[in-house]
Amino acid sequence: MAHSRVPTNWGEDHLLKRLPDARGHASNIRAPGGWIARFDKDGKNWETFAMGFRNTYDMAFNVDGELFAYDSDMEWDAGTPWYRPTRFYHVTSGADFGWRTGTGKWPQWYPDCLPGAYGIGPGSPVGVVAG
């Protein structure tokens, strides 16, 4: 991608050892995790719109053109301090929702990490409709 609306504050400088998920989930995925891009009508000029998602099954726009997404939890993290429930996000330009592999998820108090609009709890989201 030629451009990112999200600050690219991660690096592969090897100053700190990488700590992938001990169970091996997404061990080949590097920060910032899942992302949403936007591009022109010809499918060119891609740019990162938002990132830091774990596994967004579905998203939809409301009548005002605002984007909403439903992101799933990591079921085997349930009961741990870093567990994140299934969440509904209001996706804004330049947002980073902080999902990282393993225990490296950004806490919601990080200034660069947007919280979910609503926490649903354990589950697997499908079928978002907005209007």
Spell out what each predicted region is.
Residues 1-131:
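Beta-propeller domains with acidic blade repeats across secreted/periplasmic ectodomains
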